[in-house]
Amino acid sequence: LEKNDVTTLATLLGPDSEDVVSSGDEVADANARADFVASFKTRHTLVPEGSSSMTLVVGDDDWPLPIPIVAEDGKWYLDGAAGADELVYRRIGHNELGAIAVCRGFIDAQLEYASAGHDGNEPGVFAAKLRSDPGMQNGLYWPTAEGEPESPAGEAVARATAEGYKAVTGKRKPYHGYFYRFLFAQGAN
């Protein structure tokens, strides 16, 4: 885990562990593994769950690893298949909370953007995109020089960059498990 070696991790967890090892969001996965390692180093203990199963509990919050450690024929191993569903459920829940935070941040950024006029528009106009065109302020984010007021999405973009996300070049990648886009009208349903 410390080396972020996905291949070895998949081997350790057994066949059909792709959903356990990878969510499809490489940055979030690497950060989650690093958080787990840090929690493990802080504190870890094995909690017996009967005579043939244990749960690894880590960190100050006593986070239980959803993948049980089981005994079979006198050997102990991580049962990736048994823990896969629970890990995916936890990942989905975590990503949904992140998506809610992103949507709230989006609303805050749009309200901030609309509170002032940009590129000749009067106040009250919302941004139609996240990233502004070069030299423009027609999106929620534009680069600013030192001493200039930050763009409405500047703090969120800085936070995402600090987490390890990079500007999209080519194939889109999820942000905390989700893809986001601007909608300009209500759909048929």
Predicted regions and their residues:
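Short beta-strand edge/turn micro-motifs at domain boundaries
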Residues: 53-97, 104
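Extracellular/periplasmic head regions of type IV pilus-like filament subunits
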Residues: 13-16, 116-189
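Conserved hydrophobic/amphipathic alpha-helical signal-anchor segments
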Residues: 1-10, 84-137
